[in-house]
Regions:
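Hydrophobic strand positions within the blades of repeat-based beta-sheet folds
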Residues: 28-30, 46-49, 64, 81, ...
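Long, internal scaffold/assembly segments composed of regular secondary structure
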Residues: 218-311
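Blade-edge motifs of beta-propeller repeat domains
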Residues: 1-16, 50-80, 120-144, 176-217, ...
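Acidic/hydrophobic-patterned starts of short beta strands in beta-sheet-rich repeat architectures
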Residues: 22-31, 92-103, 156-165, 229-238, ...
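Short glycine/acidic-enriched loop and turn motifs that connect beta-strands
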Residues: 34-39, 104-109, 168-171, 240-246, ...
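Mobile, glycine-rich extracellular loop/lid and propeptide segments
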Residues: 31, 77-91, 95-105, 110-121, ...
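Beta-propeller blade termini
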Residues: 12-26, 31, 82-95, 146-156, ...
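Repetitive beta-architecture junctions, highlighting loop-to-beta-strand starts
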Residues: 44-46, 59, 114-116, 170-172, ...
Length: 479
């Protein structure tokens, strides 16, 4: 089920993702799927804080729940509203919109059918204006519609598509957004604006291994980008067996090519490997997106990068980086979780993507599971450990202190919150102050990266008025 609420549309240049008020500063969306709403545990909520020249502006923030006026449904225990987030200017009105997954939502179709809700951007930010809702697809009992979300443009026609996983069916589906004529001035009717695009199933066999039933497979992550370099976004779709750890032949990712017809072609790459986090970015500047996967179950954890090419990706050319790689500070230890979270952005404005890597279970200053985050830099030869940087709550200039079980690094983003063309770092620590959580903003220094710390700001549950509600801020970050 997908519900959409839209204000009137007007002719404007599309906004960057997560720029909800169209001012050029990228904003931060934080999901709290386990958050308590009233007496409803795990109902979930989403907190938004707006960007500014100085970074995250604590004076401008908002919390959305399914009890917020204008949002469909009602906050119920276990809905997990905010489990997944994705953003694009769906109606191309100059303000980014936000898609929110609630995979635990019970519907008429059954328990845990799941829903996806879109909140619309305006000059004043995200809105919950009342309007008509729309339902698409056929989520059923335990389908967990919306467990993962991604946005791309497989047609390259300027209209983004929204991709939604339906793990209970081992599939994902996508929808086109068709904005109304700018001259109409009428409110968008979501039933006419959102069009089903199609569905794809994941491969469930390798060699002689028999296909599994849909109930035995969990579609886990989605990412988009032009991996093949043909000008169309491709979809990278990762899955794992419902049992964990999954056998080697029952986990991995596929690359599905986009086309001008708006359809996804057959997989150009099928890679069987561990995937615990997923991102795409052009790390070597060749105008093809590379696929990065976090493999945090390895000793200490690692990140594997598969370079893009006209024929997809090739496992033989992958690069693996961990805490023991040349140039990476520190050393890996069992259970550190390097690669639990990853995010792509251009920190130094050199035209090559860089990668933030969360290591939330690293021991810091003698504090077990305090956590840290790393930044790895792109180069002409691809992602490298050379010049890598790490930050924690023990880093000079960072508010607070590294404490046991903070899990600093459980979530990471690289987005340009200050509108200077350089990606800033946000690190989530969902176990800060118990289960309140916090996020810490680091302003990019350009070629110098993030060290020494230039401008940093920590934002906790008190800022949003959600103390004591199991917010776990920083566990889910819009990226």
């Amino acid at each position: 089920m997908l519900s959409a609420f839209a204000p009137s549309a007007s002719a404007a240049a599309p906004a960057k993702p997560y720029d909800f008020n169209g001012d050029g500063y990228v904003d931060l969306a934080i999901g709290s799927p386990n958050g308590k709403v009233g007496k409803k545990a795990g109902a979930g909520f989403v907190s938004v804080i707006y960007g500014s020249a100085k970074g995250l502006n604590t004076a401008k923030k908002k919390v959305f729940t399914q009890n917020s006026k204008g949002i469909p449904g009602t906050a119920e225990a276990g809905d997990n509203f905010g489990y997944s987030l994705a953003s694009a200017d769906f109606d191309r009105d100059g303000y980014a919109d936000l898609a929110i997954g609630a995979p635990g939502e019970d519907t008429a179709a059954g328990a845990n059918a799941g829903t996806v809700t879109i909140l619309w951007g305006t000059r004043s930010g995200l809105t919950t204006l009342a309007g008509s809702s729309a339902e698409f697809g056929d989520p059923g009992r335990n389908h967990r519609w919306g467990e993962s979300l991604a946005v791309g443009d497989i047609q390259q026609d300027g209209s983004p598509e929204l991709f939604i996983t339906v793990p209970g069916t081992s599939m994902f589906k996508w929808f086109y957004f068709r904005p109304p004529a700018a001259a109409s001035g009428a409110a968008v009717r979501p039933g006419a604006a959102m069009e089903p695009g199609g569905a794809k199933a994941l491969p469930r066999r390798r060699g002689g291994v028999a296909a599994q039933s849909a109930d035995d497979v969990n579609a886990s992550w989605l990412a988009t980008g032009d991996v093949t370099g043909d000008g169309h976004d491709d979809v990278v779709y990762a899955w794992h067996d419902a049992d964990w750890p999954a056998p080697a032949e029952r986990r991995g990712f596929v690359v599905l090519p986009g086309t001008a017809a708006g359809r996804l072609g057959d997989a150009v790459s099928v890679v069987f490997t561990e995937v615990k986090s997923l991102a795409v970015g052009d790390f070597n500047g060749d105008r093809r997106k590379d696929v990065a996967v976090g493999q945090s179950s390895a000793k200490g954890g690692r990140v594997a990068v598969f370079p893009g090419s006209a024929s997809g990706v090739n496992s033989a050319t992958r690069t693996v980086i961990d805490q023991d790689s040349p140039g990476v500070p520190g050393a890996g230890a069992s259970g550190d979780g390097f690669g639990t979270a990853i995010a792509v952005g251009d920190v130094n404005k050199d035209g090559k993507a860089d990668l933030a890597v969360g290591t939330p279970f690293d021991e810091v200053s003698g504090r077990k599971d305090a956590g840290r985050a790393y930044v790895l830099f792109g180069s002409a030869s691809g992602l490298t450990g050379k010049g890598a940087q790490t930050v924690s709550q023990s880093t000079k200039g960072v508010p607070g202190a590294s404490e046991k079980n903070d899990n600093f690094g459980f979530g990471v983003t690289l987005l340009d919150h200050t509108k200077d063309g350089r990606a800033d770092l946000v690190v989530g620590a969902p176990r800060e102050n118990g289960r309140d959580g916090a996020v810490t903003f680091f302003k990019s220094r350009g070629k110098a990266g993030f060290l020494p710390v230039l401008s940093v700001r920590a934002v906790g549950a008190g800022t949003f008025g959600v103390k004591g509600r199991n917010a776990r801020l920083g566990g889910v970050l819009g990226r």
